[in-house]
Amino acid sequence: MVEFNLESLGVSINLSFQNFKNDTLAGSLIPLKKGTKTDLSILLYEDKKKTVIQKIKKTEFKNCVKKVRGGSYCTFFDIDKRKTFSFFEKDVFLGFVMDHALNRSFLAFQNVLDIIFLHAAAIVIKERAYLFIAPGGGGKSTISSLAKENGFRVIDEECCIIKRIGNRFFSGVYPIKPLSDTSDKIWEIGGVYFLNKSNKSRTRKLSAIDAVYRSVPEAASFYHNWVPDEDKNEYKKRIFTFLNSMFNDVYFRLLDFKIDSDVFSCLTH
């Protein structure tokens, strides 16, 4: 049994494994609550005779077929019905297919779920989520350690989801992570800070367009290798539009911070 954090997405996903003779649960993806309608379905089909793989190779899904150790597999989507179909030959490792199907589903259904993924430390302060954005080595883990020392809850040190509900934006734990005490909740974003290591802690104003351009690479890198080359520009455009909307509604600043200081005392929001 495999469990994933999906409460934070505000949706439920059903993941089932079918071998054409019976249906068994391959993974348990936490529903929002009992009786919640399934928002997305991921169906994994094992084909012992390879007939499905061969049939799909002759259709428009041919480019979806991938060769891996143990055989072939393919994944495609029915956006209208919110379903993912993944077919694989019997010797392909089921865990690999599950992981692939989940990741491809999050990529394919980002518009449906109205979410993006972001490389950022997410910290809860006064029941609001504050995001701290920086490239690799820019201080996300450091600011998270300082937050823990100051008694704040850290949603995640490296990555999180951003979900839009109406005109409000929320942050939660990245869903394909081990279960934690933050897995069943999302927090409204109270502010976004762009980290800059310095010899002095202070906040500075930043233009909205600068905030967007600093954020796009930290979001577009998610699933970048999964996106077909012909769709990469559209993928980045969608992220740009989402972030532009977010920074019209969410407080943001540049944060110069000194590692050994109480950096949280200088936050201005």
Label the model's feature ranges.
Residues 143-144:
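Post-Walker A alpha-helix
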Residues 1-86, 269:
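Long, basic/Gly/Ser/Thr-rich N-terminal segments
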Residues 84-94:
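Short histidine-centered catalytic/ligand-binding loop motif
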Residues 73, 82-84, 114, 119-121, ...:
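Generic beta-strand structural signal
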Residues 1-25, 34-41, 121, 125-135, ...:
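Glycine-rich, often acidic-flanked micro-motifs
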